[in-house]
Amino acid sequence: IAAALRLRAKNHNVTLIEKHKDLGGRARVFKKNGFIFDAGPTVITAPHLIKELFDLFNKKSENYINIKPLNTWYRFIFEDGLKFDYSGNEQEMKAQIKKINEDDVAGYENLVNFTKKIFNKGFTELSEVPFNKPFFMMKQFPALLNLKSYKSVYELVSNFIKDEKLRRLLSMHPLLVGGNPFTTTSIYGLILYLEKKWGIHYSMGGTGQIINGMEKLMKEENIEIIKGHEVTNIILNENKITGVRLDNDKEIRADNVICNADPPSVYSKLIESKNLNSFFKW
């Protein structure tokens, strides 16, 4: 959706294809027994990135979606009944940590400072840089090693925090993206600082309201939206992409195709090329 809006803002004719009957991908919602569930993210950590999409068309995001900052971000309840309210209020955070283990207050401060370094490298410097060349990727290894990316998030937190409960709550961030804190690289520790920097926000009515607002914007800007049809093949003609084929055999011609699925799946399943398919067999 973001790519479609950005391309439309540059005056491209854009067609968005979604295999489900509703938009959103990981941010879509589903309904069951009268209830609405977020299929993916529930909280918003960088609302300015959403606002940017509306700014492209000189429109106010608040006319489409209602995003509110939260005071309490998460509430942890441990097996012994201990409660911990996780927030952006550093005084309250340190006071709660002190009650559990006074020595971990300094460790918490050091952890936040370290995750700031990870954030500056992994988000600020590299989030908009394409990792499409081996040499460029290799250049990042020294910095990533210095930031202890070979450790898991839990291992990184444990370097600073002694108490087991505090270790668990401060290493929970990979869970937000479906990861395991005990195996996910410590680079994901940047989420801890990202939350501190921009806060945690909630879309009133659920994440689906953000998608509804973006869909309304796309329709206003004449982006064609095709729902309920899956792309089965990216058409390759003399080593040039010329369009896509849908599950109803309809072909849509295009000068450029953007796909946000993982590259191995795209190249091995959607593009008919023996050279590409053999490369991605691993």
Regions found by a protein language model. Give the residues of each.
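A conserved short coil-to-beta-strand element within the FAD-binding core of flavoproteins
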Residues: E224-T242
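Generic, well-ordered alpha-helical scaffold segments in large soluble proteins
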Residues: K10, L156-F160, L169-M172, G213, ...
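Residues forming anionic-ligand binding surfaces in small-molecule and nucleic-acid pockets
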Residues: T184-E195
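Short beta-strand to alpha-helix junction loop
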Residues: P142-E155, E195-K216, I226-G228
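Rossmann-like flavin
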Residues: E79-T184
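Glycine-rich loop(s) and the adjacent beta-strand/alpha-helix scaffold that form part
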Residues: I200, M204-N212, E220-E221, I234, ...
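N-terminal glycine-rich phosphate/pyrophosphate-binding loop and immediately adjacent elements
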Residues: I1-K117
